[in-house]
Every structure is written in structure tokens, then in C-alpha cells.
Amino acid sequence: MKKFGAVVLALFLVGLMAGSVLAAPQKPAVRNVSQQKNYGLLTPGLFKKVQRMSWDQEVSTIIMFDNQADKEKAVEILDFLGAKIKYNYHIIPALAVKIKVKDLLIIAGLMDTGYFGNAQLSGVQFIQEDYVVKVAVETEGLDESAAQVMATNMWNLGYDGSGITIGIIDTGIDASHPDLQGKVIGWVDFVNGKTTPYDDNGHGTHVASIAAGTGAASNGKYKGMAPGAKLVGIKVLNGQGSGSISDIINGVDWAVQNKDKYGIKVINLSLGSSQSSDGTDSLSQAVNNAWDAGLVVVVAAGNSGPNKYTVGSPAAASKVITVGAVDKYDVITDFSSRGPTADNRLKPEVVAPGNWIIAARASGTSMGQPINDYYTAAPGTSMATPHVAGIAALLLQAHPSWTPDKVKTALIETADIVKPDEIADIAYGAGRVNAYKAAYYDNYAKLTFTGYVSNKGSQSHQFTISGAGFVTATLYWDNSGSDLDLYLYDPNGNQVDYSYTAYYGFEKVGYYNPTAGTWTIKVVSYSGSANYQVDVVSDGSLGQPSGGGSEPSPSPSPEPTVDEKTFTGTVHDYYDKSDTFTMTVNSGATKITGDLYFDTSYHDLDLYLYDPNQNLVDRSESSNSYEHVEYNNPAPGTWYFLVYAYDTYGYADYQLDAKVYYG
């Protein structure tokens, strides 16, 4: 309902501001086309179908009439014939009818019984089959997604996850599936207490095969990321795909207690709540503790996108690797949950393929869109997450001494840049994972800069680079109450990338095929002070200039300036539903933001941002947290913020902080 309401709001706002609403183009009148006489009133598809049926068989149809009056007259005749009327529609003059073939032929004018003669129901336009509609999707096989994340390159180097066990905390695993036979070496069922592996939903089997399936049922085509890894099934979700937090925590606890017994190094949780979390709940603490116990914990970001603040538990846990979903073209999916967390930390860390992934289908289940008896396609961050879990197994095989923190750092700092502007992002995180580059993390050239930046201050660092295909710089800092930004300048002093997410966690900039010379990174405090560290990584040669060097020195842009305004007001979900405020944007602006504060325990307010042409460019419709909107490189002109009362307990007071950034 909230999304529909937002659309209505957008149209209403344009009408108020522009003074008029354009009328929709007139649609051409529908012409009543006569059926070919050999089909009668049946569509060709229905005519063909009934030719293969006996007269006493029933067929499901949609009967379309010229008007509602003709439709209502037909009901009595259809009842007399014994036809079953499933739906009597109001939106169109039509009936959904299940009817015997012989009676269908009579009303279609294809059969003269002598009782009805050759008379037809009056006003019938046509009769069509009530056919089954399937979701039109573009699937991605594991052969495609493995290449997308460069797992295939790891296989070519001889790494397949052998010696590593992945715990799948989910609906179970169908261990009899050809792709998973001989792989499930441990099992526990906290739902039904069964001692033999099974999956009565299909979700867990699909996830398990993405992480470590052999692809045996497809001659290796749909092979998982770490086909040599072993699996442990930890069933905490029932046949409907749901489960209690207590069971999930117990599953995490069991994985930690049995990690040495089964060699568990990675656990995958393609599950979670849809409500925004600050990462302090019991399940988030449990997965953080599993991380501290030495397990790489990989968690699905959730499927509550595209709104901000939709990362729930346990995805909001601070230590785990939270994964969003992109399609085969590295475009973020609409459903992938967006950060930040409820306490304004950056999530997810990375993204991976998760849009209609073809993987193993558990026996007797129909989850997703079945491809055949052995495979089904399904979308979700649930599918993206085991890609990363499998990659983690590859990394740990290649680097047995790596800690969970090292795995996470390597994945973040080598993730491919797939978003055209800032990399560190509440949708994409650090980018799409690259297994091959992460595995070579220790072999790449690296520089680390550390320092301290005061409130509103900045620090710059220079490095030389040559022979590189890429360079990235990732900024970390120690004060969660501060907001640091990161800028990258080429040897000519041109700003080539920037990252200012406004959230605590990390900022990342990067550039492909960098020109040889002296480059500059600049750490800027938008607010607060902090100790920081910047990791520079490249496949070329890195160094630090001595005495300034002979390369031209970059001339970083001046400190960003901010035009700030604070608006206050009161709204009510019945009497005064919305307020509109304007903000002037001048040339050279780099970002416009709005933060809406109110008492979230009693009220649910939403925030919308419109450009000078009154196009909706960002929205924030969280149900249990403050609202934030932003837009990069805004055009000059008057911008509009709309505060909307979705649900209030009486009148709701609010404060809106609007900011325009320059420089």
C-alpha cells in the first residue's frame, strides 16, 4: 500500500506545483472483430484445445461480452447448463467459466442441438482459454554466474573448495540430488527432529548447490562456486520457508560447536527479517560471535528493496559479510535490500548474482520456476549469498591461514566497480565480488596510509602508479559518530572518483587503467573527527613520491561547502497529510540530501525528493526509522521535499534537515 500511495502523492504534487495535470492520451475505440466462422466465438487456441477433448470434459474459459448487461443475461443460461462461474468481473464485462466442451460448442455457435438451435449467447465478443501465465524472466545459469564472479578462473588454477566445509543454515538439503550426492557430511534438524537430510521447501537445496554443487545432473553446466567443498545441513526453517529466531540462533550455535568435527569454515544464512535492524538483536550478536569463533559468516541482505533502511537481522550484524543481489549485467535488482542499517552503518558489503539463478531443485518441491526435474530458477539475495559463501571456500583453500576478517577485507577491496558513480553505496556496497582478484589480494601491490582528521578538516596522500589495470582505495575509520568522505585525483589534478555515503563503515574509490604518474587521495571530514586508514590496492606498481618527484602535483578541489536549511512542521494522516519545502540548488552542486526526524514510536512519515521539473528522483518510506533522501550532481533550480504522513497517532511533529553540497 505504501508504494501505491507514493505514486498517488507524486502525481498530486505535480498537479499542485504545475497548476495542471496533463490529460492522458485518448485510447482508440476497441473494434469488435468477427471470429473466423470455423472457430465460431472461440479463439484459435481454445478451438485447437477442445479438438483433443471429449464432450463431457470440462474446460476453463474467459467469456468476453460487449457490455455488462449482456454478461448478466448470460449468467442464467450458463447456470442452466451446469457451468461453474468462477468469477463475475466488474472491471471488464467478462465471466470466468468452467464448462463442458459440448456446452461450450453450443454457446460458441459451433453446434446445433435442436434445443437451442444455432442461437448464441447475445453480445459475446469471444471466448478464450483460461490459460496459465508464467513469470517472464531472464534466467542466469550457474555457468554464467560463475564466470561473472570469476570463480571459473579459480577452477582453472586448481581451486574448487576441497578441504572446506560450508554450513547451510536453511530449509534443509536434498542429499539425494545428483549435484549434492556424497557432499552432505553433517546434518541436524531443529524443526522436525529428523536424522536424515531432507528439504521440504527447496530453498536450502537451491542455496547449497549454488555454493558447492557438482552440476552432475547437467554434465557440469550448473556447477556451484566451490564444487569440491563439503556441506553440513542445518535445518532451522520449515516447509513454508519460515522459522523462529530461537531455532536459527540454535543453528548458529550448533555450527560453532561442531565446526572442528566437520571442518566447517563458512556458514551461509540466506534468511532474515524484513524490519530494519541496528545489529544489536540476539541473532545479530550470535552471528557476530560465530565470526569471532573463526567462521566466515555470509548473510543475505534481504528482499525488501528498493527503499533505504531495509536491511534486517542478521544482515545488520557488524562483522558478517552482507550480500546484495545484481543481475547478469551487474545491475542491482529492485528487490535487493538497501542500507544503511537502523543505526546508519553502511550495508551491504558486496553484491553477487542473484536474479533468477538456475540451481538444484529438491525432489518433490516446486520453489521458483522449475526448469526440469533437477533444476529450478529463483531470484533473491538468498541466491547471491551462496555465491559469496562458495567464493569464501575457494579463498580459504588457497589461503588456509586467512582469518574471516582477511577474507572480508579481500572481497571488499578487490570487488569490481559496477556502479558508474560512487562505489561505496547502500545498494552495491563495495561492488560485485571477484573471486580471482580476491585470491590474488596478497600478490597485488598495496600501500596503507594512516592519519587523523579533525572535524571539517582534510588530509591528502600521494602515491605513484605504473603498469596498472586498476587501482582502488578504501577508507576505514574508528569513530562511528563521524562522517568521512574520500576523493581520488589523477596526475593532472582532475577529480576522477569520489565516495561520500554519509554512513559509517567504509568509503571506496577506484579507477580502471590509471595513467602512470602521481595520484592523490584526499580524506575529508564532513562531520566529526576520527583516526583513519586508507588501503590502496593495484595490479600494477605502487610507490610513494620522494621530494615531490617530477610528476605534476594534483590540485585538489577546495573543501566542500554546504548550504543547510532546517524546516519544522506538523502533519496528520487525516487532516494535514503533507508539507512541501523548497531548496535552491546553484551550479556546481555535487549532492542534495534530506533527513527527516520524528518520533518513530508513534508515527510513520515518508520523505520524497523532486527535481526542478517535478520528477520524483528519490523516496524514503521506511516503516520504523527516520527517512533519508539524496541525489548526486543535482541540476540547478528549485528542488522540492515532500513530507507525507503515512500513519500518525494524532499530529506528528517533525524536523527536516536539507543540505546542498558544493565542491
Swiss-Prot record:
Entry keyword Iron: no
Q: What is the effect of changing residue 382 to C?
A: Greatly reduced enzymatic activity. Greatly reduced enzymatic activity
* Propeptide residue span(s): 24-136, 563-663
| CDD domains for this protein | Peptidases_S8_1
Q: Which superkingdom, per the lineage?
A: Archaea
Active site per database record: 170 (charge relay system), 203 (charge relay system), 382 (charge relay system)
Q: Temperature note from the UniProt entry? A: Optimum temperature is about 100 degrees Celsius. Highly thermostable. Stable at 80 degrees Celsius for at least 3 hours. Half-life at 100 degrees Celsius is 100 minutes and at 90 degrees Celsius more than 3 hours.
| GO terms, biological process | proteolysis
Question: Is Protein biosynthesis tagged as a keyword?
Answer: no
Enzyme Commission no: 3.4.21.62
Which key words tag this protein in UniProt? Calcium, Hydrolase, Metal-binding, Protease, Serine protease, Signal
Where, by residue number, does Ca(2+) 2 bind? 483-485, 501, 507
Q: Where is this site: Important for catalytic activity?
A: 303
Q: Where is the Peptidase S8 domain?
A: 139-439
- State where Ca(2+) 1 binds: 420, 423, 497-498
Q: Which GO terms describe its molecular function?
A: calcium ion binding; peptidase activity; serine-type endopeptidase activity
Record text on activity regulation: Resistant to treatment with 5% SDS, 8 M urea, 10% Triton X-100 or 10% Tween-20. Fully active although less stable in the presence of 10 mM EDTA. Activity not affected by the absence or presence of 10 mM CaCl(2). Unstable in the presence of 2 M or over GdnHCl and loses 35% and 99% of its activity upon incubation with 2 and 4 M GdnHCl, respectively, for 1 hour at 55 degrees Celsius. Nearly fully loses activity upon incubation at pH 2.0.
Q: Which residue positions does the secretion signal occupy? A: 1-23
Domain remarks in the Swiss-Prot or TrEMBL record:
The C-terminal calcium-binding beta-jelly roll domain (445-562) of the mature domain is not required for folding or activity, but it is required for the hyperstabilization of the protein and possibly for its adaptation to high-temperature environment.
* Similarity comment: Belongs to the peptidase S8 family.
Quote the subunit structure annotation.
Monomer.
Role, per record: Serine protease with a broad substrate specificity.
Q: What is this protein called?
A: Subtilisin-like serine protease
User: Which classification does the entry list for the species?
Assistant: Archaea, Methanobacteriati, Methanobacteriota, Thermococci, Thermococcales
